[in-house]
Regions:
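Radical SAM enzyme [4Fe-4S]-AdoMet core and its adjacent flexible, acidic
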Residues: 2, 139, 151-155, 159, ...
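Residues that line or immediately flank small-molecule/substrate-binding pockets and catalytic motifs
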Residues: 40, 79, 108, 133, ...
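Radical SAM/AdoMet-radical enzyme domain recognition
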Residues: 57-76, 84-197
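Conserved alpha-helical substructure of the radical SAM core
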Residues: 2-79, 83-102
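Short beta-strand/turn micro-motifs composed of small residues
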Residues: 25, 108, 261
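A short, compositionally biased micro-patch
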Residues: 26-28, 124, 251
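A short acidic, helix-capping loop that chelates divalent metal ions and anchors anionic groups
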Residues: 43-47, 137-144, 207-211
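Flexible, active-site-proximal loop/turn residues at the rims of small-molecule/cofactor binding pockets
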Residues: 42, 81, 135, 175, ...
Length: 263
């Protein structure tokens, strides 16, 4: 029998309550972003985890139940690209039924987020969506993501999610010097006043696959100064201790913007 939901959560070494669990449902993705899964490494011959070796949906649910019994409240579904995983909506439906889990979110590139799937995900119990989008202009988008379809497909996915009832959609943009720092202001303008929360992420070291260099990092300090040249933003207090993004708001009431630091 599964243990009852914990009244207190375990803490990490910094005294922060462990309330979130991130579950990667696949290592595959239809994007080949240069800072994450560059094609020269993740090409046709790359050995992804065989599908029959992935955790089955029932195994994922069991893990979620164990963590819920330890005090976890939030589940984040990730990949790769999680929408590649078959029966994703059924998985979310099962997780939503777990006692103690009160928030389920998903990080996606939104390229598969059709109107029907957005509604199905909402109906299954998905609470929040985060979309990865690093540029708005066609050339930079295709260069960064190494895909053959237009950026409008991602923007349509975001709109489909909004129409399905998802609120406060988060937009994550990784900024790399020499690649897409010119996209910062266009992104800030585009999502101003939309209800979406734009979050800029410093270029991060993900091991040996992206040839990370410190001088390619555009710091949060630089990003804030750049945006403030055109659109005034002000810092606000975090929602809770240990929140990942540093929160700011447009001074004119146009919504929230965040910064996630890597160094």
């Amino acid at each position: 029998m599964m243990a009852s939901v914990a009244t207190t959560s375990p803490m990490d070494a910094f005294g922060r309550l462990i309330r979130d669990l991130r579950i990667s449902v696949t290592d595959r993705c239809n994007f080949r972003c240069v800072y994450c899964m560059p094609r020269e490494i993740f090409g046709p011959s790359y050995a992804f985890v065989p599908r029959d070796e992935l955790l089955r949906l029932e195994e994922i649910v069991r893990i979620a139940k164990v963590f819920a019994a330890c005090g976890v409240k939030k589940i984040r579904i990730t990949g790769g690209e999680p929408m590649i995983r078959r029966n994703l909506e059924h998985l979310i439906e099962m997780i939503a039924a777990i006692e103690g889990i009160d928030d389920i979110s998903m990080t996606t590139n939104a390229s598969y987020l059709s109107k029907d799937r957005a509604v199905a995900l909402k109906d299954a119990g998905l609470n929040r969506i985060t979309v990865s989008l690093d540029a708005l202009d066609e050339e930079t988008f295709r260069t960064v993501c190494d895909v053959e379809f237009p950026v409008s497909r991602v923007l349509e996915g975001i709109e489909n999610a909004r129409q399905a009832g998802f609120e406060n959609i988060k937009i994550n943009a990784v900024i790399k010097r020499g690649l897409n720092e010119h996209s910062v202001l266009p992104l800030a303008r585009y999502f101003h006043g939309t209800g979406s929360i734009l979050r800029f992420i410093e270029y991060m070291d993900v091991g040996s696959t992206n040839n990370w260099k410190l001088d390619e990092v555009v710091s949060a300090t630089e990003l804030i100064a750049l945006i403030n040249q055109e659109i005034s933003i002000n810092p606000v207090s975090p929602n809770y201790r240990g929140e990942v993004a540093k929160r700011w708001r447009y001074a004119d009431g146009g919504g929230e913007i965040g910064f996630i630091t890597s160094v």
